[in-house]
């Protein structure tokens, strides 16, 4: 289980696209608001409704999602 210190807030700055077999996941770019990676913009996959400006809590700020492939 993750410690409280591992969870960091991040602000959604851009919606990249939908992914997953049925489009149930949104790929977003987020700006980390706290911790050692503060200010860094990373790409993450998010379940559920999300819009630009939302604050989400992410466990690992060092991990990034793979870029969406165009088919």
Curated annotation (Swiss-Prot):
PROSITE patterns: RIBOSOMAL_S28E. One of its GO terms (biological process) is translation. Keywords: Ribonucleoprotein, Ribosomal protein. GO terms for cellular component: cytosolic small ribosomal subunit. It comes from the Archaea. CDD domains: S1_S28E. GO terms for molecular function: structural constituent of ribosome. Belongs to the eukaryotic ribosomal protein eS28 family. HAMAP family: Ribosomal_eS28 (MF_00292). This is Small ribosomal subunit protein eS28. The gene is rps28e.
């Amino acid at each position: 289980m993750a410690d409280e210190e591992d969870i960091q807030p991040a602000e959604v700055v851009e919606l990249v696209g939908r992914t997953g077999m049925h489009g149930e996941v949104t790929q977003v770019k987020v700006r980390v608001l706290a911790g050692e990676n503060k200010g860094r913009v990373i790409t993450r996959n998010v379940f559920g409704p999300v819009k630009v400006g939302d604050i989400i809590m992410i466990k690992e700020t060092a991990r990034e999602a793979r870029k969406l492939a165009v088919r």
